[in-house]
Amino acid sequence: MKNFTCQCCGQCCKWEGFVIAKEDEMAAAAKLLGITLDEFIQKYTKLSQDRKSLIFADRADGACVFLSDDNRCKIYEARPWQCRTFPHEWDVPPDMQKLCPGHRLAERADATAAEALPLIHVLGHPALPMDITNAPGDAQVLNCHNFCLMLSLLGLPYIYYGCPGSKLPPGGAFVDCGKPIGKWSYRNKWHQIYNKRLSKHLAKCARLDGKPEIIASIYGAAQSDIETFGLPVIEAMVGYDHCWAPYRVFPSYAHQHTIYAQQPDFTAKNRFFDTVIPHFLDDTQYWPSSNPQDYLLFIGRDAPGKGLAVAQQAAEKTGLELKVVHNGCFGAAKTELLANARAVLMPTLYVEPFGYVAIEAQMCGTPIITTDWGAFAETVLHGLTGFRCRTQAEFVAAIRKTPQLDRNFIRDYALNHFSIKKIAPKYKAYFDFVWNVHKNGGYYADAAFRDATFL
């Protein structure tokens, strides 16, 4: 519960039940008490009735051993997750939940806060279900997933309009737009049918009650012919070669400038309301290696613009193995491959809008070697988290110098700049900004600030 604050009534610590003692939680509590884990186990735990696990001991009156006389927890800062989430995330009867005054207060506060939360209508992938396990190489499926995961983290209600088989993060509702009748291309038959379906579903799901409500387009022109019903449309995570909505979020200034140059007349109408927010990743899916190996890695599509030939030539000059992965690598296997590499090569020849692989590598603490243009100028710290190169001599020298870089610093940089937890508040601020300018005068709206820097 977002607004839960313990009222120190002691009710939950006196209820019949038991707290399972997990090793990491016992270790944290032992550290707080200034004793060893073994001492903690001996003094404060006992075997469960089925003798399969340790549970926290009880006082003589049946209350938790850590409950003080003034109804406070002696290990509150290190209390187990089981205690942190009781009773509001447990399968507890409502009449027992009502015994917790903190829970009752939080329910009222959460209900009040929910009234002000924007409802986000997420227009997803027009041809593939949102399932990153089945489409690990599709950047737009990843964008859809990450965007919804971010909304879930922010606690924002959302509705995802997508293909059958989509797997949503918690907190969202799913609207099935039906199976695609073919591949999408601009204004083809599937485009027209798809936009009609979207409009029909939006008509049913939109609140249109004056409360904050936003449409988020995650697939560009595929959704450009929808009926918006007067709601503001944000084109979020614009990494493709066009734009159509009045509010746009670019992943880099490099890509923003590219689109402004390609569509000068269209973007001039409302570029005052655009913003730049980097793409982001769930950092829990990436970890460093304690013993990295001495191979180089290239992950990317088998396309000339990805610069594979540049990577191969540079690797050959150094005599190091270059592992090449074009698709099918996902999850823990991908993270291990990234984390154990000496360096990841990403010599993209075109102006890269963002480049997820560069961020994935850095989240693993692995140096990234790129070309010196596009988004890399904004995502790679030259000489610190990797190298940005223009000649073969520079690529070769970069490969040889990567062992000198601090892999802990590289990972910390990525976590602080591209993790979902760091980026989510930027999107929330932009949602508030868009609703404000949409409802209150556009450019001249009071307090039309995209972020807290102006406050």
Which residues fall in each region the model found?
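Short loop/turn segments that flank or connect secondary-structure elements
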Residues: 1-116
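Catalytic cores of nucleotide-sugar-dependent glycosyltransferases that transfer UDP/GDP/TDP-activated
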Residues: 114-455
